[in-house]
Swiss-Prot record:
GO cellular component, one term: bacterial-type flagellum basal body, rod
Family: Belongs to the flagella basal body rod proteins family.
Organism: Aeromonas hydrophila
Gene: flgB
Annotated protein name in UniProt: Flagellar basal body rod protein FlgB
Compartment(s) where it occurs, according to its Swiss-Prot or TrEMBL record: Bacterial flagellum basal body
Length: 132
């Protein structure tokens, strides 16, 4: 009997990749907080998760990895954020407090998905070894 990793891991395998990409975008925002004209960006998580599932052929069997074009970047899913602070005069829309808060939240959610996947892998290993 074959093990279906899509069923075992659910959406958490896709959530990890989306949260990783979001961490890159948020850290770029923080790094460019003092760059004149820089516009803060973010990723719509639910839309990106749906796209990641689609790109990975969620639930579909493939005979060749050439059948699906996998992309590590998320073009079209990265959106400019509407600034919540007044214009500082340099055109930069990064609110460092908001970016740090979003980065922390994203990190906690990444860690939660990672812990869930670790517990699933541990369960699969126990099943393969015949342990309880």
């Amino acid at each position: 009997m074959a093990i279906s990793f899509d069923k075992a891991f659910g959406i958490h395998q896709y959530a990890l990749s989306v949260r990783s990409k979001r961490a890159e975008v948020l850290s770029s925002n923080i790094a460019n907080a003092d760059t004149p004209g820089f516009k803060a960006r973010d990723i719509n998580f639910s839309q990106a998760l749906e796209e990641a599932q689609h790109q990975q052929g969620f639930g579909l069997a493939t005979t060749s990895e050439k059948h699906f074009a996998l992309q590590s970047d998320a073009p079209g899913l990265t959106q400019y954020r509407n600034p919540l602070q007044p214009d500082t005069g340099d055109g930069n829309t990064v609110d460092v407090q908001q970016e740090r808060s979003e980065f922390l939240r994203n990190s906690l959610e990444y860690q939660t998905s990672l812990e869930f996947m670790n517990s699933k892998i541990s369960g699969l290993l126990k099943a393969l070894k015949g342990e309880q």
